[in-house]
Amino acid sequence: MIRAFDALSLPVLRWLDPEDAHRLAIQGLRFLPPVKPRADDPKLAVRAFGLNFPNPIGMAAGFDKSAEVPDALLRLGFGFVEIGSVTPKPQSGNPRPRLFRLERDEAVINRMGFNNDGADVALRRLAARAQHGGIVGVNVGANKDSPDRVGDYVKLIEAFAPVASYFTINVSSPNTPGLRNLQEGALLDDLLARVIDARERVRQKAGDTPVLLKIAPDLSLAQLDDVVQVARSRRVDGMIVSNTTIARPSTLREEMRAKEQGGLSGRPLFRLSTRMVAETYVRVEGAFPLVGVGGVDSGGAALTKIRAGASLIQLYSSLVYKGLGLVEEIKRDLTSTLLRTGRDSLSDIVGADAATLTAEDWPGM
């Protein structure tokens, strides 16, 4: 059924302006029949951050910015969904056009700028679906014009703790000026200290909601050392590696589109983001799990990301080119790999190639 839907919808959506196509996809999912998803093979189950994931495939933040369709996405077979980025106040984001397809590269450039309906609207939607179950994380960000960006994160933690399965602290978007500075040592330490304190203040009414940190792929290894050290010292529950890149690989074929400002995602990000997963994995030393993001467009790519050190993976841009059927395809491929190799679970292979990957030459961009 999903494959038939993809066959009909993908040509139409790709003909439309990218942002109009995205809006149409959201509207279509709002009317998705409430069908029960196919049960996942138990071998795909993952335990991470104190949560039980039915499978390791998540919808990355950026697709459902304001919590309009998390349950529809779960019914399509995702093991978890991350909504956002949400900011305290609504904001329209950067001027259009701000979303670009690089068709021949199977890539996307965006400079959206945290456009979303604001915390009140997203909170109301998540509260209304609380009884539905499923893992729905909340990616939190700061308003562009905020005089206290760290305070924005604190407000969101306190507000969403009762309805969030986990939080992602997004300090790595390249589309809000100055935001990536919060990845730097003392600033990051202050941010995480205040976020964890906020989580502790609402623990009694909301439980121990996991806090994850999402980082950029453009960090130097020295910067990564500092980020991991701070994350470990502040006892975050995990990291998401990685956000979009501001780099432009020399191999990009859509040369004119590649000049657009913003974050690059999709297939060209795969090698860099996977290397960053491996580099992070060896530095974390098992202190917490990782979520791998960037260029996952097949079962083989998902497996590579897991072997680099990711316990879970997320995708988004690849759906633009492969359709929603990609989720079930990846799950089938992962299950087949486990059966063929006699493994009982994906945890048996997490990080198996990390040492090898970190010894290789740095992937060219």
From Swiss-Prot:
It comes from the Bacteria. Its cofactor is FMN. Pathway: Pyrimidine metabolism; UMP biosynthesis via de novo pathway; orotate from (S)-dihydroorotate (quinone route): step 1/1. Its EC number is 1.3.5.2. FMN binds at A61, G62, F63, D64, K65, S85, N139, N170, K214, S242, G266, G295, Y316, S317. It is found in: Cell membrane. It is a peripheral membrane protein. GO terms for cellular component: cytoplasm; plasma membrane. The active site is at S173 (nucleophile). HAMAP family: DHO_dh_type2 (MF_00225). PANTHER family: DIHYDROOROTATE DEHYDROGENASE (QUINONE), MITOCHONDRIAL (PTHR48109:SF4), DIHYDROOROTATE DEHYDROGENASE (QUINONE), MITOCHONDRIAL-RELATED (PTHR48109). This is Dihydroorotate dehydrogenase (quinone). It comes from Bradyrhizobium diazoefficiens (strain JCM 10833 / BCRC 13528 / IAM 13628 / NBRC 14792 / USDA 110). The lineage of its organism: Bacteria, Pseudomonadati, Pseudomonadota, Alphaproteobacteria, Hyphomicrobiales.
